């Protein structure tokens, strides 16, 4: 036991684990929620875990020399993995089989690389968001580690600042290059660096839950979980929402076409001025672009009907006369920029297929003898203005009706934006401001989430891609959907169209350098 700055630091064997857990309340499951009945009962105690490691460059090997565990109000430090495993086993032996202690780790993916060397994980014990990206893992059927970095999408220092923690991650003079072993004595400064990480993380999670009215059972696992929860509740208030959404959900064939058409923002360096230093540059920030287009543009709101190959006349009639949302696979012959000095060519080489005779600028198409691509009607309008081409052929086509997104959904967006604007600069509501700002930023990610993202499992001491039948998996995921994937495709398309309109207003950026504008 060591006393330092009014904090008592215990070694693992000095803690009466059984007595602490016996006197800690359990979080009851919400009544009327049958889905929770089979889930573990959560111990109502916020815990945090962290390790410090040394890297030996000669053998390219890292090892842990100290670990720290914030066990509720108790701060624990240990020096060996044997101590750590024994401590976890004492937790296991002190609770029921259906109970769990929740422990937050900032960047669990790093600690997991050490944990996998001391514990044989099975596939059900590890939740991978990607290869080597661990959202949570479980040990001994008793302790669940959750990644607070994935939860907050912030560094620990940023997270603690935004949650107004009294304890902060220490920064400055700590020598991370010093070789330390489990038997190396640590001075008070080094110990302070170690324990502050778990003290501050525990405080940040606690402050956040208090601000949001959450507990360890209801707190979202990821940063996008907050906005998903809010929007899902809003959609459930829409009359016949389930039928409304499920009438629009794509089948596998349409999903593939939507994946082909989906792309993100339009970011590119003007080939004529890249590397030059410009003067008299004026910048324009298109604030909250994705929330803006979600509220102020229309989207496909009926099921897409596949019409197969189509003539250009039929496509243009559907687009311009009937004002339908269009998704097309199209081939262009002899396509090239109308303006040679165009600084941001729209067509991306990665989103085109079977391209021949192409001339490219850092992945963008300046011209090509032939190419195929999948686009929305919004994309087509941009391409038609920017490029000239011959004999376009529509290889496949889908059509839907345009309409506003559900008011229940857009009201949430407007309310969040209103709150963020009202609370900006208000020190008494800084946590709510930061949470609302983060939720606004997460709106796009929620709408554009790929329902068939690769799923990884960890077993046999390695990562494996989970084998699935994509069509069956899509049907399974569709059962729980409260948004439709095509909305995400159109969100980015409308945002690119708005950005392109600003670029067009700014000029070509070469002959009007004094009026050049960078649009973000």
Language-model-detected regions and their locations in the chain:
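N-terminal accessory regions of nucleic-acid-interacting proteins
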Residues: 1-47, 51
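Conserved acidic
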Residues: 41-42, 60-106, 112-520
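Short N-terminal binding/cap micro-motifs at the start of the first secondary-structure element
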Residues: 55-59
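Activation of the activation-loop gatekeeper triad in protein kinase-fold domains
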Residues: 51-52, 287
């Amino acid at each position: 036991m060591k006393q330092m700055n009014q904090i008592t630091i215990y070694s693992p064997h000095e803690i009466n684990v059984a007595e602490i857990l016996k006197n800690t309340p359990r979080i009851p499951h919400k009544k009327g929620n049958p889905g929770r009945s089979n889930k573990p009962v959560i111990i109502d105690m916020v815990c945090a875990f962290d390790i410090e490691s040394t890297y030996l460059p000669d053998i390219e090997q890292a090892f842990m020399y100290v670990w720290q565990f914030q066990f509720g109000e108790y701060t624990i430090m240990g020096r060996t993995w044997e101590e750590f495993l024994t401590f976890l086993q004492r937790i296991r032996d002190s609770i029921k089989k259906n109970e769990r202690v929740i422990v937050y780790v900032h960047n669990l993916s790093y600690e997991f690389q050490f944990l996998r060397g001391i514990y044989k994980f099975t596939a059900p014990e590890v939740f991978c968001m990607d290869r080597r990206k661990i959202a949570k893992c479980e040990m001994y059927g008793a302790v669940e580690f959750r990644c607070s970095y994935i939860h907050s999408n912030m560094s620990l220092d940023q997270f603690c600042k935004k949650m107004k923690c009294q304890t902060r991650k220490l920064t400055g003079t700590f020598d991370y290059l010093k070789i330390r072993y489990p038997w190396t004595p640590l001075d008070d400064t080094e110990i302070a660096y170690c324990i502050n990480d778990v003290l501050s993380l525990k405080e940040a999670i606690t402050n956040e839950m208090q601000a949001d009215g959450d507990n360890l059972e209801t707190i979202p696992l990821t940063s996008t979980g907050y906005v998903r929860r809010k929007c899902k509740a809003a959609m459930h208030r829409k009359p016949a929402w389930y039928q409304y959404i499920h009438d629009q959900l794509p089948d596998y064939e349409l999903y593939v076409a939507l994946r082909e058409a989906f792309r993100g923002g339009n970011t590119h360096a003007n080939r004529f001025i890249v590397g030059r230093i410009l003067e008299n540059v004026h910048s324009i920030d298109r604030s909250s672009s994705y929330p803006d287009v979600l509220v102020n543009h229309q989207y496909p709101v009926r099921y897409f009907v596949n019409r197969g190959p189509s003539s250009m006349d039929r496509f243009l009639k559907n687009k311009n006369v009937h004002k339908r949302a269009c998704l097309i696979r199209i081939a262009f012959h002899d396509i090239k920029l109308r303006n040679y000095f165009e600084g941001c060519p729209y067509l991306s080489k990665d989103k085109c297929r079977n391209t021949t005779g192409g001339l490219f600028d850092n992945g963008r198409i300046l011209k090509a003898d032939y190419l195929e691509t999948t686009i929305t009607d919004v994309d087509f309008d941009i391409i038609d203005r920017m490029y000239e081409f011959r004999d376009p052929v529509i290889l496949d086509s889908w059509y839907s009706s345009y309409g506003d997104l559900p008011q229940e959904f857009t009201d949430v967006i407007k309310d969040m934006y209103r709150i963020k604007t009202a609370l900006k600069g208000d020190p008494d509501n800084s946590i709510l401001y930061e949470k609302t700002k983060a939720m606004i930023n997460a709106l796009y990610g929620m709408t554009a989430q790929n329902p068939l993202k690769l799923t990884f499992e960890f077993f046999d001491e390695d990562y494996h891609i989970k084998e699935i039948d994509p069509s069956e998996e899509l049907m399974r995921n569709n059962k729980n959907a409260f948004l439709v994937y095509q909305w995400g495709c159109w969100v980015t398309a409308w945002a690119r169209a708005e950005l392109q309109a600003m670029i067009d207003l700014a000029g070509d950026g070469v002959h009007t350098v004094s009026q050049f504008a960078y649009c973000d």
